[in-house]
Amino acid sequence: MSLKNKFKNFFSLDDEEYEYEYIETDREEIPEEHESKDRTAYQSKAAGKQNVVSLQSVQKSSKVVLSEPRVYAEAQEIADHIKNRRAVVVNLQRIQHDQAKRIVDFLSGTVYALGGDIQRIGADIFLCTPENVDVSGTISELIEEEHQRW
């Protein structure tokens, strides 16, 4: 082969040598009956998955914070605990009555805004709970009965 033919073959394509053959194959069609069974099975599996609850969405542990404020400024810290979805037991026995009333008013507004609840559970002791905590039962009736016995 001459040098001229080598260059010609190198830079140009010879149509006869590089012709591709296309073979068309018919795809096998799936019968509709089989396809509908697969869809039904998939849909039932998908429906079953809707009943599964993610464990990550469940809170690992609930916390209850005990607080004994000595000044009104500590009410903000208590409100922050409630905002962070923690229940708080507030003991107001070591603070003046007018300051205690202001704290209860502030915490009442906080739990109302957050959809929570505030309950008196003893003499100058309150339980503030966020919306994710349910409290059942009452102990204030028992306290009143004890005072009547003495």
From Swiss-Prot:
Cell division protein that is part of the divisome complex and is recruited early to the Z-ring. Probably stimulates Z-ring formation, perhaps through the cross-linking of FtsZ protofilaments. Its function overlaps with FtsA. GO terms for cellular component: cytoplasm. Belongs to the SepF family. Keywords: Cell cycle, Cell division, Cytoplasm, Septation. Residues 26-45 are annotated as: Disordered. Homodimer. Interacts with FtsZ. It comes from Bacillus licheniformis (strain ATCC 14580 / DSM 13 / JCM 2505 / CCUG 7422 / NBRC 12200 / NCIMB 9375 / NCTC 10341 / NRRL NRS-1264 / Gibson 46). It is found in: Cytoplasm. This is Cell division protein SepF. GO terms for biological process: division septum assembly; FtsZ-dependent cytokinesis. It comes from the Bacteria.
